[in-house]
Amino acid sequence: VDSLKRVADSLTAKVNEAKTKGLTALQVPKKEEKKASRPEDPVEEGTDLVVRNLLTGEEKKYKLVTDYLFSKKGNTLVIETSKKNGDTLSKANVIWVSTASGKVDTIFRKFNDAKSFSLDEEGTQLAFVAERDSVAKALRKFYKLYYYSIGQDSAKLRVDRSTAGIANGLTVNDFANIQFSKDGSKMFFQVAPIRPIKDTNLVDFETARLDIWHYNDDYLQPQQLRQVDQELRRGFMAVLEKGSDKVIQLGDEDVENVTLVNEGNADYVLANTTKGARVAAQWQGFALQSSYIVSTSDGNKKPVAKNVRGFFSASPSGKYVVWYDWQKKQYFTYNVESGAISNVSKNIRTSIWDEDDDHPDDPPPHGTMGWQENDKYVFIYDKYDIWKCDPDGKEMPVAITNGRKNNLTYRYWQLDRDQRFVKEDQPLLFTIFDNKSKGNGIAYVRLNKPMQQTYVYPAAQIGFVKAENANVLLYNLQTPSSHNVAVIPFEENLSGNISNAVVLSDINPQQKDYNWFTVDLMKWKMFDGKMAEGLIYKPENFDSTKKYPVIFYFYEKDVDTRYFYRAPAPSASTINIPYFTSNGYIVMDPNIYYKDGQPGESAYNSVVSAAKYLSKFKWIDSTKMAIQGQSWGGYQVAYLVTRTNIFAAAGAGAPVANMTSAYGGIRWGSGLNRQFQYERSQSRLGGTLWEKPELYLKNSPLFRADKVQTPLLIMHNDADGAVPWYQGIELFTALRRLGKKAWLVQYNGEDHNLVERRNRKDLSIRLSQFFDYHLKGAKPAPWIVSGVPATMKGIDWGTTVEPEGKKAF
């Protein structure tokens, strides 16, 4: 009986176990078998890398390559290879190839991932980060820094979380680049916080999804979300000196932006931060900077300057830190050895800031040309000239050009991208811009010799490249009707004279078969009595006995582009000038001259005065004038149709219609708040909405929508990351409510300007049809007459115009 009871109890226990664990618990246990090894996770295999000697034609092929890096001198090639799926003997490797001998050494094996390869200047040292210990799907992986030098048998571990100098909670940052100093004595890398990982046991539908905006956040939530990937990869610079086993941390949460000085050879780095000043960027558009020098030997920080509106940089040899203070409108230097701060521009007799800037804000500087060898001088621009300045502020500044006298602007064109300074006897290339004619030229200059005669031509000369072993410049030569590649000698007495240039190309030869355009500089007196400038484009076959329709296109100031080539192309947002002139239009592009607090009236003063002036010419049909603009130009178009009825049609792309609602909005492309734009930037209102509400109302087209008589075509796309899409909707719905003639073209998924060519072609057709109908009396397209209902979306675009006398099936 007892034995039967024990059997019954055993069966009962098995049944209960089966209820909880499943029926497998009732199965007869199998004999232990040797566990089969788990197959390795498949990897993304590398591809073939072919290295060819261009002189001999000899080739070498490397298989399964996932990454590679040549040294600067080409003497070393580092290759990372993957394992081959299905081949248990295949492993990932890092290979060192000496290109001269062809010798191949495997210097690193048995790892899951390796990246951020960096070679020193001589191609004899290598650093990289690698991860060896985690499974493929691990949520957290710890990378380590490895180092190899010629002569070692393999790469050695140099830095991990336990290395001296690595603070608790930090690890090697696997997302950052690694750099050697120029002399190879230091290795710069990054450490990063060990971030918490997501709890995979949490179920999405049981957890809240939200963003919390806090008034003390450095950045608004939309900006944080736009930058979240960048922030998750953020690290802090650190350095390991050759022969040392201790890491020196150079950056941290307080000074996060660190740059090398003298290519890393200096005994300090430059660290800048905006910490403590970021909230104000919401309405200022900038954050004040503080700058420090940080020792690479012990991490000690010394302040250079605090809470300055400006950007700091080190001189090439590292003797000075230089910055422009926007509020003081001066350049300052910090002498690293003495700690002295000098105002190096105080004795420059002219404005080194943009005196033509018309924003209610501190004007920006014209910038610097760079430094002379050994940090002897720093060169500072004014509007016209270049000033040689003593970085200690003891010598008087000297202008090395004479542009102001002749209304010419000189700027240095750096021919050698790797050159960090200029030498006194070095041939330099200066570009020249004629502020009167808008022509361009170049000059051959030596700092230790007087300036030569300069030449200016009705052309644009850009993109200069010097031949490495010859005194010849290759460049882009543009005129309004041609765009070609040319060469010119880079020698004394020859470079500036364009007659010495040889044109090498004949780009767009088919252009001769089309009606092109001419462009002239036009000047007129505005309503406020001041003189204005603009560009007027006429058809190549212009006939002064005929009358032409006119489209005014504008943004801010474009006259300096007088001699630039303009290519016919589908429109991203604005009218294509070659297309419209070729089709019998005159296009006028007037400069806009702004006054603080009056952006709308400034546009009226500039554009309408230009229209009145142009109307005096017999070849202008003053009843057939239109305006078109995009973004800021779109706003000005929207404002102008509330102020005047002289235009027969208008096109406004991405216009701000209501400055009161747009003021607190977000630029969704960047996550930035829009307040700074209205207070200090493009809108130029000069105050907050609550300080100057009357300016926001006066300059908002929406509040004068009842005055509009001009047919208005609006384009505003539903993925606009710059101007909120609802601004176009506010304007359109107001005009629709008032019974005005208005159209809103909205491209799905498109940003501020159109990207997809199919949409650009479509907009080009609609712009042409819209203006042809209103200015030339052409038959209107169906979309103009009756729109396109949602039921016909993707079936009928409404752009097909049937010829007169024919009916569609």
Tell me the role of every PLM-derived stretch.
Residues 1-475, 481, 493, 781, ...:
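Beta-propeller folds
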Residues 51, 96, 238, 248, ...:
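Hydrophobic/aromatic beta-strand patches that form the interior of the parallel beta-sheet core
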Residues 135, 150-152, 294-300, 317-319, ...:
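Secondary-structure transition/capping motifs at alpha-helix termini
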Residues 274, 433, 478, 553-557, ...:
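Glycine-rich His-Gly loop
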Residues 336-352, 393-407, 447-449, 491-499, ...:
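Active/binding-pocket-proximal capping segment
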Residues 347-359, 498, 505-624, 628-630:
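Cap/lid segment of the alpha/beta-hydrolase catalytic domain
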Residues 478-480, 485-488:
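Blade-level signature of beta-propeller repeat domains, shared across WD40, Kelch, NHL, RCC1
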Residues 566-809:
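Active-site-proximal cap/loop segments of hydrolase catalytic domains
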